[in-house]
From Swiss-Prot:
Family the entry assigns: Belongs to the universal ribosomal protein uL4 family.
Quaternary state and interactors: Part of the 50S ribosomal subunit.
NCBIfam families: rplD_bact
GO process terms (BP): translation
UniProt gene name: rplD
Protein name in the entry: Large ribosomal subunit protein uL4
Function summary: One of the primary rRNA binding proteins, this protein initially binds near the 5'-end of the 23S rRNA. It is important during the early stages of 50S assembly. It makes multiple contacts with different domains of the 23S rRNA in the assembled 50S subunit and ribosome. Forms part of the polypeptide exit tunnel.
Gene source species: Wolbachia pipientis wMel
Length: 204
């Protein structure tokens, strides 16, 4: 598979070879759904917590005698039926992470890249070595491409990161950090030639 190789000014500088095992994978959207759920679950802090009957402040004494009052028997004023009492079965601090097979995660990355390539939303860059230091300069480069949001994957420098940091529709990540959620969350995915080599070593 061959596609155009361009620079950040959208000038054609050659051709790039794409591996069909990565960019022509069979589409299984259910796997993408599973991986996105897995990624979002891992991101959750899990710091939610309510106070149970043993956590709330209050006396431990029995409020009144078991018999002779005519009222329902009570053993504690910290019970959930009283004002200021504990919460039963409330959320506790826990991890929402669960495991997902490595083969499924690899296959999901192939599916996501193939889906973008199928919709002509993958751009191959020669490199990210460009003299851009200001956000306004980065805007001019990005306007050469007719997409609403961009995920740029490659070994970028501090100047490029600083220039793109304030653009809400542009995200830069290293090749090792490429993931399904970020691919699907951006309209256009920009990959460098070195990133293609990294993906072949990672996914094949």
């Amino acid at each position: 598979m061959e596609c155009n190789l361009v620079n950040l000014s959208n000038d054609n500088v050659g051709a790039a070879q794409l591996n069909p095992l990565i960019f022509s994978a069979k589409q299984k959207l259910s796997i993408l759904h599973d991986i996105v759920r897995w990624q979002l679950a891992k991101r959750r802090a899990g710091t939610h917590k309510t106070k149970g009957i043993s956590d709330v402040s209050g006396t431990t004494a029995k409020p009144y005698g078991q018999k002779r009052t005519g009222r329902a028997r009570q053993g504690s004023l910290r019970s959930p039926q009283f004002r200021g009492g504990g919460i039963i079965f409330g959320p506790v601090v826990r991890s929402h992470t669960y495991s997902l097979n490595k083969k499924v995660r690899k296959f999901g990355l192939k599916i996501a890249l193939s889906l973008k390539y199928l919709n002509n939303q993958v751009i191959i860059l020669d490199n990210l070595n460009i003299d851009v230091k200001k956000t306004s300069e980065m805007c001019k480069c990005i306007k050469n491409f007719k997409f609403s949001s961009f995920l740029i994957v490659g070994d970028y420098g501090d100047d490029l990161l600083r220039a793109a940091k304030n653009l809400h529709y542009v995200d830069l990540i290293k090749p090792i950090g490429l993931n399904v959620f970020d691919i699907l969350n951006h309209e256009c995915v920009m990959l460098t030639k070195d990133t293609l080599k990294h993906l072949e070593g990672r996914l094949l």
